[in-house]
């Protein structure tokens, strides 16, 4: 839908260049239970379909590719890597400089106009806390002078929790870890040649090719669940070594009611922050996730996907307690933290 898609911007959005049959199977199975959506970035997100990708000519088009790389040679831009920001220095509550460390050398960078803090949902609140902005009693517990008592800093952490089901399938069409699958190891070099010469083939895949936005309750105005169908087996963010080929499907809670916190562990910026996402602390989140698991498996158990339904972690679909136990044991972040810098 051209009304919802720009045409000339630097960050390119494109259709996938590789047509994986298993992604088609997912969409076909899902469309027997939900409507088909050919453009998730159009006027309506609900339905089952194939995701668009931020690619150009089959290669990743990230924010760095689109915006940073073209600007790197500007005389008024200095990029500092291997740098840790400690805190922002203030004068009468006006940000005037930034204290940081680059390769063990401490620097203070003074602002001529303004300072923009873009450290993300974990970095920004911890920098503010070390700078003296946050909950006064918490700052005092670390012997930090409170410049501004803002109780929302480091609070209200919300994140999308995600559960994955993996299915082992012996197929040439699916991804696997290098040398963990004979089929993929044999096919990968030929696909690499295709990618280098024509920017086509498996290596143009984003892996999470298909998906859906669905409702746990049809009375809802908008979807509260998202599915990602991945043309490879995934466990523990890819850290778990698995032999063979397969596919996975994620179910993600889009509107969690559970909230957590992020706080500094000390005044040392090299110390990892204390992150408590507090997942599933609200009972309604678990209720929706259980419904979401069932809706996901309803698609997995529908042809043409059902013929490949060799689940690595099977659960009794009729047992709420078993589903809840699996969700508590195996769910994890899908990297969408927000909400920790309430001003």
Placement of each model-derived feature along the sequence:
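FAD-dependent oxidoreductase catalytic-site/capping-region signature
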Residues: 1-42, 49-51, 190-343
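A short acidic-Thr-Gly-centered motif at the start of a beta-strand
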Residues: 69-73, 108, 343
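Glycine-rich loop(s) and the adjacent beta-strand/alpha-helix scaffold that form part
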Residues: 88-202, 267
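Structural detector for helix-capping/boundary residues
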Residues: 66, 83, 113-114, 341
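Stable alpha-helical elements in mature extracytoplasmic
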Residues: 22, 26, 63-67, 123, ...
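Alpha-helix boundary recognition
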Residues: 31, 69-73, 129, 140, ...
């Amino acid at each position: 839908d051209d009304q919802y898609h720009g045409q000339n911007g630097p960050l390119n959005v494109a259709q996938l260049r590789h047509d994986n049959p298993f992604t088609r199977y997912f969409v076909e199975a899902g469309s027997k239970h939900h409507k088909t959506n050919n453009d998730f970035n159009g006027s309506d997100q609900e339905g089952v379909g194939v995701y668009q990708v931020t690619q150009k000519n089959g290669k990743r088009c990230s924010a760095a590719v689109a915006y940073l790389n073209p600007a790197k040679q500007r005389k008024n831009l200095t990029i500092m890597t291997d740098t840790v920001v400690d805190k922002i220095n203030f004068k009468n509550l006006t940000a005037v400089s930034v204290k940081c460390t680059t390769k063990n050398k401490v620097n203070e960078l003074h602002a001529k106009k303004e300072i923009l803090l873009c450290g993300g949902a974990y970095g920004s609140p911890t920098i503010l806390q070390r700078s003296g902005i946050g909950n006064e009693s918490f700052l005092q517990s670390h012997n930090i002078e409170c410049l501004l008592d803002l109780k929302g800093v480091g609070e209200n952490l919300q994140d999308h929790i995600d559960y994955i089901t993996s299915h082992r399938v012996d197929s040439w069409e699916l991804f696997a870890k290098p040398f963990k699958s004979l089929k993929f190891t044999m096919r990968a070099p030929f696909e690499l040649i295709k990618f280098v010469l024509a920017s086509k083939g498996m290596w143009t895949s984003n892996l999470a090719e298909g998906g859906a936005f669905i409702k746990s309750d049809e009375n809802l105005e908008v979807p509260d669940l998202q599915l990602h169908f991945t043309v490879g087996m995934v466990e523990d963010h890819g850290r778990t070594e698995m032999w063979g080929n397969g596919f996975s499907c994620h179910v993600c809670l889009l509107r969690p009611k559970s909230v957590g916190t992020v706080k500094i562990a000390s005044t040392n910026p090299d110390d990892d922050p204390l992150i408590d996402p507090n997942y599933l602390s609200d009972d309604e989140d678990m209720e929706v996730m259980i419904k979401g698991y069932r809706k996901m498996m309803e698609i997995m158990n529908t042809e043409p996907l059902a013929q490949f339904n060799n689940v690595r972690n099977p659960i009794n679909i009729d047992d709420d307690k078993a589903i809840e136990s699996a969700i508590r044991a195996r769910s994890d972040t899908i990297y969408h933290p927000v909400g920790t810098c309430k001003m």
